[in-house]
Design a protein with these regions (language model features):
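Conserved beta-strand-loop-beta-strand element in the redox core of flavoprotein oxidoreductases
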Residues: 1-16
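Conserved flavin/dinucleotide-binding core of flavoenzymes
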Residues: 5-7, 24, 33, 54, ...
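Solvent-exposed residues in well-ordered beta-strands and their adjoining turns
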Residues: 11, 61-63, 102
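Short, flexible loop/turn elements at secondary-structure junctions
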Residues: 12, 20-26, 64, 143
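Flavin (primarily FAD) binding-site architecture
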Residues: 19-42, 59
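Phosphate/oxyanion-binding loops and surfaces in catalytic or ligand/nucleic-acid-binding neighborhoods
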Residues: 28, 65, 128
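Central beta-strand plus flanking loop segment that forms part of the substrate or channel wall
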Residues: 42-69
């Protein structure tokens, strides 16, 4: 008999059918799928055990690159945490200073109003540059901790989880194969996600 095809039914009513598929979405999204038949218990446990890092990027658009050095970066002990030049080696007098925070620092920056967040960021820069508010044109935010599809930025393997959990997550389920940055040796980067997709195909 011919092997059963994989049927994907979407929330908008669309249906797709294939001989085999590669599932490369984060484990949070995998948990939202109604699998029929259901996934093996061992795989479900592995999916639930994998955690994801909470990352926030808070770019500041500036009318002038007041930090001067194209290679500028800076670490602080404030919630704003880490800064780097987001428009490095790009032409123009304006620039983007990227504020990058993880964990509780990212949570705190993402949870406050835009004006308050700007104040926190500007205060973190003040010891090095003084008052830079006149240079600020706009500020933006993306917080992966509340991303509706991943609820995290990249997979965060706890102690021993790399060897305990990853092999189970990689195991195919019927005609569904799994890939993604969380299953890559170069884990946490899009290059790793791409390589894991190539590995799944082979």
């Amino acid at each position: 008999t011919a092997p059963k095809k994989v049927v994907i039914k979407c929330s908008n009513g669309s249906t797709f059918e294939a001989d085999k598929i590669i599932c490369s979405i984060p484990t949070f999204a995998i948990k939202q799928i109604q699998w029929n038949p259901i996934l093996p218990t061992q795989k479900i446990d592995a999916i639930h055990s994998l955690q994801y890092a909470r990352i926030g990027k808070f770019p500041i658009v500036c009318t002038e690159r007041f930090w001067k050095d194209e290679n500028f970066d800076m670490v602080t002990d404030t919630p704003a945490h880490y800064f780097y030049h987001g428009t490095k080696n790009q032409p123009g007098s304006q620039g983007v200073l990227m504020c990058y925070a993880i964990g509780e620092k990212a949570d705190s920056l993402a949870s406050v109003h835009k004006n308050q967040r700007e104040e926190i960021i500007l205060n973190a820069l003040k010891p090095a540059f003084g008052n830079v508010k006149p240079f600020i044109k706009n500020s933006l935010m993306y917080y992966w901790g509340t991303d509706p599809f991943s609820y995290g930025a990249y997979a965060f393997y706890g102690k021993d989880k790399w060897f305990e959990v990853m092999p189970t997550l990689k195991q195919a389920f019927m005609n569904t194969h799994f890939a993604g940055e969380h299953l890559a040796d170069w884990q946490g980067f899009m290059e790793g996600a791409l390589q894991s997709g190539l590995d799944a195909v082979s």
